[in-house]
Amino acid sequence: MVHFHPFGNVNFYEMDWSLKGDLWAHDPVIAKEGSRWYVFHTGSGIQIKTSEDGVHWENMGWVFPSLPDWYKQYVPEKDEDHLWAPDICFYNGIYYLYYSVSTFGKNTSVIGLATNQTLDPRDPDYEWKDMGPVIHSTASDNYNAIDPNVVFDQEGQPWLSFGSFWSGIQLIQLDTETMKPAAQAELLTIASRGEEPNAIEAPFIVCRNGYYYLFVSFDFCCRGIESTYKIAVGRSKDITGPYVDKNGVSMMQGGGTILDEGNDRWIGPGHCAVYFSGVSAILVNHAYDALKNGEPTLQIRPLYWDDEGWPYLSV
């Protein structure tokens, strides 16, 4: 049986999302197992946060106490233990955690994979198993193998989207046994801004009412209050595209309807994820808090859909 991100019967629209506790986070994703919530985000060994209610958060350590040895083969210049931009999915009884190994501003990168039977460290079966590399890029490639996101199409077939700058957002079909690229799978470019520096990254694809929605981040993160990150979205009837924005502009030609570009306090929102529970949905992302000198901070907000099926945030 396929599960995307199990949230049970939680009604996200009835919750108060005034988050509290340890909220430092960059590139967050969420999962829920039983009554407990988990956030995974960029940091030493992939950082983990946990919550009993989705609102009050505390740090819970990391996935990898030390980095897998194989990464040096792909990213020899990396000399610190920060792993980037995880994504997690639950498939056939196993949690699959994808993550990025790279150095800033280069496309010498690799996406790795770890698995676990449970997210609860109190469970005797709790153990993150290194499953090695998934896909990599080199300086001679026109894409950047970071920012992974796994999506299942309407037939239950898993796909991996990823990408940052270079030629933009990529998509490749996964093998259902290994959850790595299928033999002879074709690498597809599904979104590009069409001009240098092609500041698009962090894809996240969800399916709703017959449409695939591609959420991406435009412009520049990681500059604190000088960040220009913003969240954009397009949609397609086919997982491979073409994705178009609300005005019908192709995301292969710079299209993308802006969902959130921040405000005076919350600067540069981006690297988002979207989750459903019944008819309700949430948007999970980081933004830079101007009241805390640009500290990257976890945000979780209700995500609504208009009569034409386009997502929006409440004012």
Swiss-Prot record:
Database matches in Gene3D superfamilies: Glycosyl hydrolase domain, family 43
Binding site residues for substrate: D27, G105, N144, A145, I146, D147, S164, F165, W166
GO CC list: cytoplasm
Residues holding Ca(2+): H271
Co-factor(s): Ca(2+)
Pfam family of the protein (one): Glyco_hydro_43
UniProt main location, coarse: cytoplasm
Protein localization: Cytoplasm
Bilayer-crossing regions: none
Annotated active site: D27 (proton acceptor), E201 (proton donor)
Assigned EC number: 3.2.1.99
Important for catalytic activity, responsible for pKa modulation of the active site Glu and correct orientation of both the proton donor and substrate (site feature) positions: D147
Cofactor binding note: Binds 1 Ca(2+) ion per subunit.
Pathway assignment: Glycan metabolism; L-arabinan degradation
Marked site positions, Important for substrate recognition: H271
Oligomeric form and interacting partners: Monomer.
Function: Involved in the degradation of arabinan and is a key enzyme in the complete degradation of the plant cell wall. Catalyzes the internal cleavage of alpha-(1->5)-L-arabinofuranosyl residues of debranched arabinan, linear arabinan and short arabino-oligosaccharides (degree of polymerization from 2 to 8). It exhibits marginal activity toward sugar beet arabinan.
Family: Belongs to the glycosyl hydrolase 43 family.
Protein name in UniProt: Intracellular endo-alpha-(1->5)-L-arabinanase
